[in-house]
Amino acid sequence: MYPVSEAFLQAVQGNTRKYYWSGKITTAGGVVHSFDQEDIVKGSGYITAQCCGNSEIELGAVYAAEMGISLFLDIDRYTLEDAEVELSYHLRLASGAYETVPMGIFEVSEANRTVHVLELKAYDRMLRFDRAFNGFETIGTAYGMMALCSTACGVELAQTQAEIEALPNGSELLSIYPENDIETYRDVLYFTAQVLGGFFCINRAGKLEFRQYGETPVMEILQKHRFSSSFSDFVTRYTAVSSTNLRTQTSEYYALETDDGLTMNLGVNPLLQFGLEETRAELCGNILDALSKVNYVPFDSDTIGNPALDLGDVLTFSGGQADDQQITCVTSFTVKIGGRQSLKCVGKNPRLSQAKSKSDKNISGLLNQIEAGKIGIHTFTNASEYSIGETDVRIISIEFASKEENHTQFFGQVVVDVAADPAARSANA
């Protein structure tokens, strides 16, 4: 949660509130266009962000936040290329003073103009990391990887080297395996966040920030603060991770002592390929320790809104159908300017951990088709020659076993070196 005063937290949960939004647009040339609540087309503004997909908790997320807004401003849209938009939320406290919460810095990607309205769509600085990466010989700690991406893409880091090195695997020396699918600096951040056991996002100051999933609630959302809500009847929790070792072409499995939850598949992480087996086990064990804090109830709720909430914040819900003994986490949110705030936490059911999804079944079917189309030819030659005389001698013997249905054909070839015994014959003509 963005640091705010206790007076702000009390005011934002009150039955009524007085607030307004403001912002400014800074062009690439340094020209500043300020706007306030009256310049915003009612119902047009929104901010949406996420740290997971639409179905399950993820490690290594590097999602970009999106902002859209329509303004009654007379600005030439062609001057807004590479412009930045800053938004702020101002809430009146009980004392009568206003407290300001920055809502982020976004870079304009689209600017459309109608007769009276300027329509903007913008994304945060995460998109800057979509630049080609060619440092395949890179070696360093997680902070070194972050600093490399930060310098190359022009985005400041929110944390110091000491803060990153204090994290799980933060002080380990990492190296990029030559055989990898890294294309951009964003891919490097993805794999680095996996090793650290969390995700990256751009914070409200426009800096790259690493966050982990926690277990300490930052606030409670009461029933009177919710317009609608739905809660799952299960708790998402992870008790194992699996990682593919490219050198041995095997999937390595690491689990807690009681392994009865979901398994996080790390796939082929090029930063987890080098080192001894014990080193890989330690790295994956630290990732599992960070992941084991995930003990969340998936939910979806429309609330009166608290603009100070951030991705990764742990919440509790009470009242109605909510279980106040369980915790949950904000994995995505949408803030409507002048409207509601939608909060969501995704997660899979541990009871279905062994079940295959439709996509998994389709992939398995395709792999089976590929395997079915393979033709294998194996040639065997006897180690030594056989001498054949008047008695029967077995010269070909094949023992065959298959783990699946196959069509098999056997062909035998006997190369004979015949030596005839000379015999004297006579005949009369």
Give short role names for the model-derived ranges.
Residues 1-23, 27-29, 120-122, 131, ...:
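Acidic, low-complexity/disordered segments
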Residues 1-139, 176-182, 187-197, 202-204, ...:
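Assembly/oligomerization scaffold segments
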Residues 35-62, 258-294:
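Short beta-strand/loop turn elements enriched in aromatics
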Residues 52-55, 106, 312, 393-397:
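Short structured motifs
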Residues 56, 95-98, 112-235, 263-265, ...:
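Charged- and aromatic-enriched interaction segments used to assemble
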Residues 149, 408, 426-429:
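Short, intrinsically disordered, charge-balanced linker/junction segments flanking boundaries
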Residues 368, 388-402:
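Short beta-strands within extracellular/lumenal beta-sheet-rich domains
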Residues 401-411:
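Extended extracellular/luminal ectodomain segments enriched in beta-structured repeat modules
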